[in-house]
Swiss-Prot record:
This is Group 3 secretory phospholipase A2. One of its GO terms (biological process) is mast cell degranulation. N-glycosylation does not affect the catalytic activity, but is required for proper secretion. A nonglycosylated form is observed in several cell types. In several cell types, the N- and C-termini are cleaved off. It is found in: Secreted; Cell membrane; Cytoplasm, Cytoskeleton, Microtubule organizing center, Centrosome, Centriole; Recycling endosome. It catalyses: a 1,2-diacyl-sn-glycero-3-phosphocholine + H2O = a 1-acyl-sn-glycero-3-phosphocholine + a fatty acid + H(+); 1-hexadecanoyl-2-(9Z,12Z-octadecadienoyl)-sn-glycero-3-phosphocholine + H2O = (9Z,12Z)-octadecadienoate + 1-hexadecanoyl-sn-glycero-3-phosphocholine + H(+); 1-hexadecanoyl-2-(5Z,8Z,11Z,14Z-eicosatetraenoyl)-sn-glycero-3-phosphocholine + H2O = 1-hexadecanoyl-sn-glycero-3-phosphocholine + (5Z,8Z,11Z,14Z)-eicosatetraenoate + H(+); 1-hexadecanoyl-2-(9Z,12Z-octadecadienoyl)-sn-glycero-3-phosphoethanolamine + H2O = 1-hexadecanoyl-sn-glycero-3-phosphoethanolamine + (9Z,12Z)-octadecadienoate + H(+). Residues 146-287 are annotated as: Phospholipase A2-like. SUPFAM superfamilies: Phospholipase A2, PLA2. It comes from Mus musculus (Mouse). The keyword Transit peptide does not apply. Pfam families: Phospholip_A2_2. One of its GO terms (molecular function) is phospholipase activity. Disruption phenotype: Male mutant mice have reduced fertility associated with reduced sperm cell motility, aberrant acrosomes and flagella resulting in poor morula development. The litter size after intercrossing heterozygous mutant male and female mice is significantly smaller when compared to wild-type mice. Nevertheless, mutant offspring are born at approximately Mendelian proportions, have normal survival, appearance and behavior. Mutant mice are resistant to both passive systemic and active cutaneous anaphylaxis. Residues 115-143, 285-350 are annotated as: Disordered.
Length: 504
C-alpha cells in the first residue's frame, strides 16, 4: 500500500512543463542510496514564481527519476521550520560544496526534460514496468519498492525498509507511516472493494486508521511529522471511509443477475479531516543562500554526531559541502534495525530504554495470545487489550527485573494488566472423541505482573518514572506494545536530550 508522502503524493498536482530556473537555494537535504551518494535531494529554491520546495530522486545509475516542485505555503513553512529550528537541522546543508553545486546545476538543466518524461504516457509505462520488474538485474529496484521522503523508510510511495522493524532517521513519523501502512481496511488506487471503486491515484483507508495516523503524527511534535500531516490531509485531501452492514448482492449469476442477497460491509466515503500543524510560526527573516556562495571564514564547531562518526570511519570530508562546514554531516545516515539514531540518544539510558522496548516486541510475537473481544481456547477475552500466555509475560517480567522500565512509559506497562492465561486439557473430554489435544485457556492472576506493577509504582513514587511524554494509544488500539513503547521513549529523548546533544 504505502502512505503517500508529502513530496511524492503531490505528483498529481504537478503543473504543465515550464522552465524552472531557481536563483538561489538553501536548506539542502541529501540522502544517499546504495551505489549513489546522491539518491535524493530536497531544498528550498527561489525562482521567477517565488519560493518553492524542490525534490529530485536518482537511481543507482545516477539517472534522474523524479523531480517535483511544490509551492504550498504550509509545506514550505514546515520544511523551513525543520531546517531552522529542529535539533536535526545539522542534517541540512546551508552552503553547498562544489559537488552539490554541480548537482544543482545539472538538475537545473534537466528539470524540464524530467517533468516532460513524468507527464508522458511513455514515462508512466516505464515506471509501471520498473515497479513490476523482478528480474535479477533489477535487484536494487526490488529493494527500493517506492520513493520515500528523505530520512524515512515508510513515508512515501511504497517503502525502502529492508525488514518490518527498520526505521529511518526520522523515527517518529516513520513509525506512524509504518503503522498506517498496516491498516487492514483499504481500497487501492483504481481498485474495487467494499462496494465502491477508488478512482483516485492514492490508496484510501478506513477512517479509524486515518484518525490513528493523524494522532500519531501530532504526538511526535516535530516539523517532519507536520509536513506529512499537512500533505496527506490538507494538500492531497485524501478521504477515508467507514463500513456499514447493508443488504447487497453476495452471489451473481453468470449472465449478471443477482443469485443471492445477504448482509455485507459496504464503504461510505467521509471527507478528509483537516490537519492543524503544531509548529510555531515565528517571524524569522529568510535569506536563501546563493547557489555559488563564497567559502565561509568561520568554520562551525564540530558536533558530537561527527565526533562519534569519526570513531568508526576514516572519512573526514564530503564533496557536497564547502570546506568551511565540512565538519557538519551532510547526509542522513540510513536507519539500521535495532540501532537508534544519534539524534535520539542520551547516553546509556537510551540504549537501555531501547532494549526494554525490544523486549515488548517478543511479547507482541507471543505464540499464544487472545486478542480483544476474541474467543480462543474456549475463552472470551472481553478486555480491550490482548491477553497473553503466562510464559510470555513471565519472560517479560524476568527481563524487566534486570532492566528498569524507561522513564515516562508508565501507561504502557499499565496496559499489560495483571492477568494472563494458562492452557490445560479439557476435563470432560472422553477418549475416542478426538479432543485429547484440545486445550482450554484458564485466566489467572499473574503474581509476576503484580510485582512488576508494584515495582513501577515504587519507581514513580521516587520520582524516577517521570511524566508521560505523550499519550499512548487508547485501549483497543491495534498499535503493538513495542510501537507504543518506542513512540513514547523517542518523544522523551527528543524533548529532553536532543537540544543538549546538538548544542554541545
Amino acid at each position: 500500500m504505502g502512505v503517500l508522502g508529502v513530496l511524492l503524493g503531490v505528483l498529481a498536482f504537478l503543473e504543465g512543463s515550464h522552465t524552472r530556473h531557481w536563483d538561489s537555494t538553501s536548506c539542502h537535504l541529501v540522502q544517499p542510496i546504495p551505489g549513489n551518494p546522491l539518491g535524493s535531494l530536497s531544498f528550498l529554491g527561489k525562482d521567477a514564481q517565488g519560493l518553492a520546495l524542490f525534490q529530485a530522486f536518482w537511481d543507482t545509475h545516477h539517472r534522474l527519476q523524479v523531480c517535483i516542485r511544490q509551492d504550498e505555503s504550509e509545506l514550505i513553512t514546515a520544511f523551513r521550520a525543520l531546517c531552522a529550528h529542529e535539533p536535526l537541522q545539522h542534517s541540512f546543508i546551508q552552503t553547498p560544496g562544489p559537488a552539490l553545486q554541480r548537482a544543482l546545476a545539472t538538475l537545473q538543466s534537466q528539470w524540464e526534460a524530467c517533468q516532460r518524461s513524468q507527464d508522458s504516457p511513455t514515462g508512466a509505462r516505464e515506471k509501471r514496468a520498473i515497479e513490476q520488474s523482478g528480474a535479477p538485474d533489477r535487484e536494487h529496484r526490488r529493494r527500493r519498492r517506492g520513493w520515500t521522503i528523505p530520512g524515512t523508510l515508510w513515508c512515501g510511495v511504497g517503502n525502502s525498509a529492508e525488514n518490518a522493524s527498520e526505521l529511518g532517521v526520522f523515527h517518529g513519523p516513520d513509525l506512524c507511516c509504518r503503522e498506517h501502512d498496516q491498516c487492514p481496511q483499504t481500497i487501492s488506487p483504481l481498485q474495487y472493494n467494499y462496494g465502491i471503486r477508488n478512482f483516485r491515484f492514492h490508496t484510501i483507508s478506513h477512517c479509524d486508521c486515518d484518525a490513528r495516523f493523524q494522532q500519531c503524527l501530532r504526538s511526535q511534535g516535530d516539523s517532519i511529522s507536520d509536513i506529512m500531516g499537512v500533505a496527506f490531509f490538507n494538500v492531497l485531501e485524501i478521504p477515508c471511509f467507514v463500513l456499514k452492514e447493508q443488504e447487497a448482492c453476495v452471489a451473481w449469476n453468470w449472465w449478471g443477475g443477482c443469485r443471492a442477497y445477504g448482509s455485507t460491509p459496504l464503504a461510505h466515503l467521509r471527507p478528509r479531516t483537516y490537519y492543524n500543524a503544531s509548529w510555531k510560526a515565528e517571524a524569522t527573516s529568510y535569506t536563501p543562500s546563493p547557489q555559488s556562495p563564497a567559502p565561509s571564514k568561520h568554520p562551525q564547531k564540530r558536533g558530537p554526531q561527527q565526533t562519534q562518526a569519526r570513531r568508526h570511519s576514516t572519512t573526514t570530508t564530503t564533496p557536497f559541502q564547502t570546506p568551511a562546514i565540512s565538519s557538519r554531516p551532510d547526509m542522513i545516515p540510513r536507519g539500521q534495525p535495532g540501532v537508534p539514531h544519534l539524534g535520539f540518544q542520551d547516553g546509556p539510558k537510551h540504549q537501555s530504554a531501547h532494549r526494554v522496548c525490544r523486549s515488548l516486541r517478543h511479547l507482541d510475537q507471543c505464540e499464544h495470545q487472545i486478542k480483544p473481544q476474541e474467543t480462543k481456547f474456549h475463552l472470551l477475552n472481553s478486555a480491550q487489550m490482548p491477553l497473553f500466555h503466562c510464559d510470555c509475560t513471565r519472560r517479560l517480567a524476568r527481563f524487566l527485573r534486570l532492566h528498569s522500565p524507561p522513564a515516562g512509559t508508565d501507561k504502557v506497562w499499565d496496559l499489560l494488566g495483571t492477568t494472563c492465561f494458562k492452557l490445560a486439557p479439557q476435563l470432560d473430554c472422553a477418549e475416542g472423541k478426538g479432543c485429547s489435544r484440545d486445550h482450554r485457556a484458564i485466566k489467572v492472576s499473574a503474581r509476576h505482573l503484580q510485582r512488576l506493577h508494584k515495582s513501577r509504582l515504587h519507581f514513580r513514587d521516587k520520582g524516577t518514572g517521570g511524566a508521560l511524554a505523550q499519550p499512548v494509544e487508547p485501549p483497543g488500539s491495534t498499535m503493538s506494545f513495542y510501537s507504543q513503547c518506542l513512540q513514547v521513549t523517542q518523544a522523551i529523548w527528543r524533548r529532553r536530550g536532543q537540544k543538549k546533544f546538538w548544542s554541545s
